[in-house]
């Protein structure tokens, strides 16, 4: 319908504003973040060309697997646990070997490590390589300035910082990459080929594949909320929320997988103190109104992952923290901290009642 055509056009334009891009093309297609990862690699790097993946965890390793599945010549720089790849190591590597592209996960959802992608970009700009940023857990919550930094692709998904349901693979692509894709002629993809999608992104009234109308409408609303708040304000709020949550968790005896300079403002990957069992904790926390994810890979059973991104208000943060204290009390952990359980439960009930009235 003409209404949906206008909505998709607006969503595409808003997406570019969110990543501070004026020179490039935005793409919103049915799929998940992993599809966006595939699309980024397939359209920027030809078979047997060399790509360097900067990894600080599970999703950097996934990017390596995707690259290898397409026959790309892939090297990986793996950070130490709790850290990102140091910019100096990146500089040394790309001075020794030529790469078509460098890929970095901005925030690894499995480890909670945030990488200094702005610093990476300055180093990569000295070379001819493309810079691809996996922003699935960062875009819209942590600063990403595509044009100013010289980033060639920012890929992301709908369900994280945009605060809408999953189902969309989202990319913003530089003119350099579009021209490279045109020179490559054929690639081993059809649905993932940006050249098949480009005419639709320029004129959504055309057909290539059925769009997921409801998800795109939700995504548009998400972008409007973000731009109404203002991106600079949004970045500051994410930082303040993260600081509030981390301070409380530290006081309660928890610790984090990332070291201090690498803590992400969009989620925390939290190590359990002695005496707290993963399954019981997460089940009880859910019963108290807050769902957190378990650990991935080697961290399974050892950590929980708490997202604090999107349109999170401070009343929601306080509710989650009071629910956390109530959870710890009910599983018998508060005796070790010598905290006042009755005060905690009263505060929890007060926050819960306030939220009920707001609804």
Which positions does each model-derived feature cover?
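A glycine-/small-polar-enriched, mobile loop at the entrance of the PLP active site in fold-type I
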Residues: 1-28, 34
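Conserved beta-loop-alpha segment that forms the PLP phosphate-binding cup at the N-terminus of a helix
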Residues: 24-52, 56, 60-64
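Active-site phosphate-binding strand-loop segment of PLP-dependent enzymes
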Residues: 85-140, 153
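Conserved active-site segment immediately N-terminal to the catalytic lysine
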Residues: 147-159
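Active-site C-terminal subdomain of aminotransferase-like
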Residues: 159-247, 251
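Conserved PLP-binding catalytic core of the aspartate aminotransferase-like
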Residues: 255-287
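PLP-dependent enzyme catalytic core of the Aspartate aminotransferase-like
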Residues: 298, 302-359
